[in-house]
A protein has these predicted regions:
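N-terminal nucleotide-binding beta1-loop-alpha1 segment
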Residues: 1-18
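Short beta-strand/turn micro-motifs composed of small residues
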Residues: 9, 53, 99, 128-129
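Active-site glycine-centered loops adjacent to acidic/histidine catalytic or metal-binding residues
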Residues: 11, 101, 188
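Short catalytic helix/loop segments, enriched in acidic residues and glycine
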Residues: 22-36
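Conserved N-terminal catalytic core of the sugar/cofactor nucleotidyltransferase
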Residues: 32-94, 107-108, 147, 152
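Short beta-strand-to-loop acidic/aromatic patch adjacent to the donor-nucleotide binding site
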Residues: 93-101
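Conserved core of the sugar-phosphate nucleotidyltransferase
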Residues: 105-187, 197
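Hydrophobic helical membrane-anchoring modules
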Residues: 189-205
Length: 205
């Protein structure tokens, strides 16, 4: 059956200073959410894909009509709240939640994260990236914390046992990944430019 992928695509994207919905910002000539969809579709460990949208992302919801994915409308409050809402509404079991703004993500990275979750034996896993890696790519990072002497920030990728979503505290594995595919998410115009540069560089290899 595999893991259910839940793409979080209902946020306001206020830091972008753009009228375009964040999942529809283009990298490599395609909306960024399409890169995430492709990675999930090709991942061996993903059995189905659900996309969480909101009133803030109506164009994204319309784009998704051409894809074989389920769509759930969430309140559009914030990532964790909307993730919980989607999991409860659809009664999901093992879920990989991922932001819609990771244009470099690929199926190999997705499978690696799921495999790490399955090995760790904990009900939840959060992927983080070191600020050092972010800085090397010219990226910023908010909401960080210290882990084993490193300053890390959430990557916007989580795996959780949806059957335990209502528990206040879950034992959580912290998975540090310093791959650019995980580090590169888009919150500002500058980060969109960096994403395009990295995407074109990868094409030339």
């Amino acid at each position: 059956m595999g893991v259910t992928a839940l793409i979080m695509a209902g946020g306001k994207g206020t830091r972008m200073e753009s009228s375009e919905e964040k999942p529809l910002l283009r990298v490599g000539g395609k909306p960024v959410i399409e890169h995430v969809l492709t990675a999930l579709k090709n991942a061996k460990r993903i059995g189905s894909i659900v996309v969480a949208v909101s009133d803030y992302t109506p164009k994204t919801a319309k784009l998704l009509l051409k894809y074989p994915v389920s769509v759930v409308k969430t309140p559009g409050k914030e990532y964790v709240s909307d993730m919980g809402y989607a999991i409860r509404t659809l009664n999901l079991q093992t879920v990989l939640a991922i932001g819609a703004d990771l244009p470099l993500i690929d199926s190999e990275v997705i499978d690696d994260i799921v495999e790490h979750y399955e090995r760790c034996g904990k009900p939840a896993l959060s992927v983080v990236v070191s600020m050092e890696t972010k800085a090397k790519l010219g990226l910023g990072g908010k909401y960080g914390f210290e882990l084993s002497g490193k300053h890390v920030v959430p990557a916007g990728i989580n795996v959780i046992d949806g059957r335990r979503i209502n528990e206040k505290e879950l034992d959580e594995e912290i998975y540090v990944s310093d791959r650019k595919e995980v580090a590169m998410n888009i919150n500002t115009v500058q980060e969109l430019r960096i994403a395009e540069e990295l995407f074109q560089k990868a094409l030339r290899k």
